[in-house]
Amino acid sequence: MATLALSWCLPLLILLLPLATSSASAAVNGTSRFTCFYNSRANISCVWSQDGALQDTSCQVHAWPDRRRWNQTCELLPVSQASWACNLILGTPDSQKLTAVDIVTLRVMCREGVRWRMMAIQDFKPFENLRLMAPISLQVVHVETHRCNISWKISQASHYFERHLEFEARTLSPGHTWEEAPLMTLKQKQEWICLETLTPDTQYEFQVRVKPLQGEFTTWSPWSQPLAFRTKPAALGKDTIPWLGHLLVGLSGAFGFIILVYLLINCRNTGPWLKKVLKCHTPDPSKFFSQLTSEHGGDVQKWLSSPFPSSSFSPGGLAPEISPLEVLERDKVTQLLLQQDKVPEPSSLSSNRSLTSCFTNQGYFFFHLPDALEIEACQVYFTYDPCAEEEPDEGGADAPTGSSPQPLRPLSAEDDAYCTFPSGDDLLLFSPSLLGGPSPPSTAPGGSGAGEERLPPSLQERVPRDWDPQPLGPPTPGVPDLVDFQPRPELVLREAGEQVPDPGPREPFSFPWARPPGQGEVRALNARLPLNTDAYLSLQELQDQDPTHLV
């Protein structure tokens, strides 16, 4: 019977053995949690928790860095019924063993009989999982009845983030627990704190912790050891709550200011009353400025205004005449001059006054003209008055009817430098000598060397072939020279008061304009003058040419 019983139980035991083995394995490989932190120097602290209890089993944590040649192992020690912890010591406390580029492989190995079984594994990044050591050296710096200054130090913190830290502190008052204590946060590296609103002669406890701002999984350090301190007792006769007195004074001042503003706004007689209250010595200006009161009745605006009417500031005389300056094309000059010549001239005045003017401003027209030099243009304005030359009347039997004016005196060499007349075919607004060079000086009147000027065909048709200009007579004493000059690109002939006899039959006529005989007056051209080659004629040069007539 016993043999039959054993044979029957043996298959049953074989069937139950795998179930028992699987249940034991599940206890060992139950749900676990493996967490490690780096203190930024030479310590890695790990905590491993297992749901199923392990009996008589030793476990270790092994560390293998990927960039280092060392490896470390620590023994897991039980801290509770289902959790174990250990510290991997990598070197001296203040040595920097790991950096941000290091990765450490951490494994939890548990012993099963004669062999080791891996329970957990993790690729650990030190500077992503930071937890510093708790602050140390807490001490009371200064204590009063309502406040207390406390300082501390941090230990084993890496220089990589020593300036990027934050702190949390809490104070335990009597009758409360640490969990009920309010937290005070310091968002900068500040290794001290001033506790206020404390109760006099009361016992307190203080704790602080630190956390770096770097790292994704960084957490707070453990709380420091509590620091116990006691505030000073309050002196007799003094207010135990000083801030209450300051609050009352501030509120009283605010309400008083509001009431004062309200009264000043709503009171009708505020002006005189305020002047009496805020009366200050203001000097009377009438004592120093008698005219202010006597003439202007105290009106400062009239006193400061000008004593002359505004109309006195406007110019009383007529505005000076501004000579117009025109720029004409080359082919239009001859037509305009011919049209001007066709206009009938007024009869000669009985006073025998002749008006002459001569202007040149060749350089002003050098801007964008055909065949002209390119220089910078400028605006030039001159005022001038016509030159009046009064000539004495000549009576007698030899004087012809009509009282012809006296002949003009020839211009000097200095006058020739600024009063020029171009050739008939080249009636430009400036001297043609600028392009071709100066012409040779003219010889004596009537000589064979005198240059002859050809008229345009339109002018030659109007001039008789048997007319010839008479040479200019000697200068008449007492005849004034030109008074005012204005640079103007026109060619103006001087009117000469000289009776002209009948010209010779074969001598060519050299005047561009001529008046037929019988009218009693002939427009004569000045002698051939040297051409001006200067771009501008300054005012000083004009005065130098005739010092007796200043412009």
UniProtKB/Swiss-Prot annotation:
Q: Which domain of life is it from?
A: Eukaryota
Q: Does the keyword Membrane apply?
A: yes
Which region ranges are annotated with the description Disordered? 389-417, 430-484, 496-517
Signal peptide positions are 1-26
Q: Give the GO molecular function terms.
A: interleukin-15 receptor activity; interleukin-2 binding; interleukin-2 receptor activity
Q: Where is this motif: Box 1 motif?
A: 278-286
Q: What is its main location?
A: membrane
What does the entry list under GO cellular component?
A: cell surface; external side of plasma membrane; plasma membrane
Bilayer disposition of the protein = Single-pass type I membrane protein
- Annotated S-S bridges: 36-46, 74-86
Where does this one sit in the cell? Cell membrane; Cell surface
Reported function: Receptor for interleukin-2. This beta subunit is involved in receptor mediated endocytosis and transduces the mitogenic signals of IL2. Probably in association with IL15RA, involved in the stimulation of neutrophil phagocytosis by IL15.
What the record says about family reads: Belongs to the type I cytokine receptor family. Type 4 subfamily.
Q: What is known of its domains?
A: The WSXWS motif appears to be necessary for proper protein folding and thereby efficient intracellular transport and cell-surface receptor binding.
Instruction: Report the protein name in the record.
Output: Interleukin-2 receptor subunit beta
